[in-house]
């Protein structure tokens, strides 16, 4: 094998969404790709019915799939969501559209189905995928890694370039931390989450809009529901693990000791949602309570030998629906740098320099978005700011672009979207202060401030 051939070998740990996408992109460009996954092949039916985990696919992720030639196949399995349907007790559900029309929507996609499409795509491009083999250790000096199966049998492999796409609890990240200081900073969240289910029959009985992301805001806690193709919905309850010290009586998972306690909680706090959850007691007891955290790293790579991407590099909370989209965007950027750079060390350094600021930005915006989803969506002040923002977007479409639109419907770098969003937020807050409706607001004066503070964007990529 020549030195050039050797330089185009890659070993990927983790056959989730980011790992399979980067495998397909590199294999299509002639790289020799070996992908290792500790779990069994999800495409092989075992008879066990897993949980239905849904993700929100936005333009960043859709663009990545488009480049990989898989967008059409994925969207055929997805459900369009035109906006947030906000449920507040005592008022009719209120649809808050995401964008101007059906060109600005997001898509609900089952994670398992998306993973299967990407696995097929990686194999079709020539990648070799090895299941039931988890990473145990990495010897960077010898460029060898050790894998093992469920029986404890160990296998040693040589690697030239190692990509860690193995999620929040990354074994590659752990191995890298033994040879370089990754600058890890973990920020745990007081909230956990629990996944529940609305059946197709229940969604039909209660006339639940199928083309929307549903939100039941409740301040310190909330429920969301994403649609499935069969008109069922995957519901997620976000709630504190423990009651805050200052509010010892506030609801938390620790108080919900079983399914019956969960039912009583839903009957009190989500009275319109509770009747839709036919299997609440069983779902609550059988589905684990998930943990949420944000992990920030200052270092993503070890020279030209190893690099992290997706959740392995930047775990984030799910409140902006961008974790998957950011990971798929990572995969595209990494493949492009590896294809164009003179050597792997240059490629990994350039990839890190490009993506780190954006990862930090979307991590911050995801944390901020919890407040918007759980509280602001039902606030009159927020709704007035949103209405004024829509008017400014119509008057100055190249200058005032709602932050949600920049994040969700464009590929403008997250860091730029965040910076512009902060300026826009301050403009709106100042403009609506002491006003209860638009009639008393000087729209021309607000527009003047928009043109003064926000340079035009010639195009949104």
Swiss-Prot record:
Superkingdom of source: Bacteria
Binding site for FAD: 17-18, 37-39, 56, 111, 135, 311, 324-325
Catalytic activity: L-kynurenine + NADPH + O2 + H(+) = 3-hydroxy-L-kynurenine + NADP(+) + H2O
Keyword terms: FAD, Flavoprotein, Monooxygenase, NADP, Oxidoreductase, Pyridine nucleotide biosynthesis
GO BP term, pick one: NAD biosynthetic process
Effect of residue 373 to A: Abolishes kynurenine 3-monooxygenase activity
Cofactor(s) it depends on: FAD
Positions with a binding annotation for L-kynurenine: 84, 98, 369, 404
Pathway annotation from the record: Cofactor biosynthesis; NAD(+) biosynthesis; quinolinate from L-kynurenine: step 1/3; Siderophore biosynthesis; quinolobactin biosynthesis
Keyword Oxidoreductase: yes
Effect of residue 320 to A: Slightly decreases NADPH oxidase activity
Documented EC number(s): 1.14.13.9
Effect ascribed to mutating residue 372 to A/Q: Strongly decreases kynurenine 3-monooxygenase activity
Effect of residue 98 to A/F: Abolishes kynurenine 3-monooxygenase activity
GO molecular function: FAD binding; kynurenine 3-monooxygenase activity; NAD(P)H oxidase H2O2-forming activity
Top EC class of this enzyme: oxidoreductase
InterPro entries per UniProt: FAD-bd (IPR002938), FAD/NAD-bd_sf (IPR036188), Kynurenine_monooxygenase (IPR027545)
Field pH dependence: Optimum pH is 8.5.
PANTHER family (UniProt xref): KYNURENINE 3-MONOOXYGENASE
Summary of the function given for this chain in its UniProt record: Catalyzes the hydroxylation of L-kynurenine (L-Kyn) to form 3-hydroxy-L-kynurenine (L-3OHKyn). Probably required for the synthesis of quinolinic acid and the siderophore quinolobactin.
Family: Belongs to the aromatic-ring hydroxylase family. KMO subfamily.
Name of this protein: Kynurenine 3-monooxygenase
Species of origin: Pseudomonas fluorescens
Primary gene name: kmo
